[in-house]
Amino acid sequence: MEVATFGAGCFWGVEAAFREVDGITSARVGYTGGFLDNPNYRDVCSGRTGHAEAVEVTYDPAVVSYDALLDLFWETHNPTTLNRQGPDVGSQYRSVIFFRNSEEEAAARASKEKLQRSGKHSREIVTEITPASQFWEAEDYHQQYFEKRGVTHCRV
């Protein structure tokens, strides 16, 4: 099993999208990319922790590739808006790929460049590509948020 971590705005919808993928054995939401240890939702929403709302997925690379996960990441949000997804504004909602090794970094950069060249977005893609750091699992009420409430997705 492998692990991948993505930030693409509010983590509820991103988690729901990844949970639908064959080969993903688990997905959990949390906070990463900042400097405060063991942050909570209120801390992260203050905008003073450096953390992003993120989804950490565990997946079987024999069933689903990292490149396929990158494709889904791009589909779940607008990567051209800086620190914003829909009505959610703040650095915690930034678009970011957290890589764990040089292969993931290269794949993420190539995927970003390919999407930029595709012309799908008229504006520059502002997604960060940065080394993975400590992932702090979010409070239980955030886990499987949509599933627990019978909601299928959010609107960006």
Predicted regions and their residues:
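Flexible coil/turn and secondary-structure edge motifs
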Residues: 1-156
